From Swiss-Prot:
Annotated compartments: Cytoplasm, Cytosol
Intrachain S-S bonds: none
Taxonomic path: Eukaryota, Metazoa, Chordata, Craniata, Vertebrata
Protein name in the entry: Ethylmalonyl-CoA decarboxylase
Keyword list, A-Z: Acetylation, Cytoplasm, Lyase
Amino acid sequence: MAKSLLASSLSVRTKILQTGVSLYNTTHGFHEEEVKKILEQFPGGSIDLQKKQNGIGILTLNNSNKMNAFSGAMMLQLLERVIELENWTEGKGLIVHGAKNTFCSGSDLNAVKALSTPENGVALSMFMQNTLTRFMRLPLISVALVQGWAMGGGAELTTACDFRLMTEESVIRFVHKEMGIVPSWGGASRLVEIIGSRQALKVLSGTFKLDSKEALRIGLADEVLQPSDEATALEQAQEWLEQFVSGPAQVIRGLKKSVCSGRELYLEEALQNERDVLETLWGGPANLEAIAKKGKHTK
């Protein structure tokens, strides 16, 4: 009986990791269509996606009049873009950045003020947790390019990316305590995964302004880019990402899937996932070409 329950639990966890599967449904008290109707009432800004032929996507937060704060419409569009990326089989990498040299200042306060009941807060939390968890599980190697400020929900969004690049003048700040709340888009859990529980508690309770040097020191940032304008920084980010996404898309996507399963699944299930991914690659075009080109004993 116990083995049966464990196998069932593992199966559920594995299914959750599958691309395109929502984190919540009505059994969790989550009514997605109702939340969407509420968010539609708060227009403004856009989430723009460019899918390049080299397999790198560019996701732009565009609401520059409000430091790229998330309006309700932008939250809806972010989910739409995630679904689009889930179906982009040629994709290998993704860069997330904000328009006009600012990453994101969090949620638009107009929406926050209107959604002031605990019920609305929890519904919004579940919507964004679902979106950003699906984002995190995309079979794409993702990079947050932080220019200017990444605050509140913007700081949480950076943690959903695999890597974070910062320009010298940029700042990441989790301001939730000063707003009388806690991170609710999954940011606290992901921050613990990235920098450890002790550092995460300091960052969240201290509401520190993490400049690029401090973020690099504690392991939140992966590299600091030289001073540059928006276009040049984006070019630098693409060059940085290219070192990790060179090669066949199927292989890069398989690597990301393997890392996701290793992070989120029990060991036995993660090992099974490794074998499942390997089965799609072993003896495939990339594998056979590499063997023929390099030979078994060459370096």
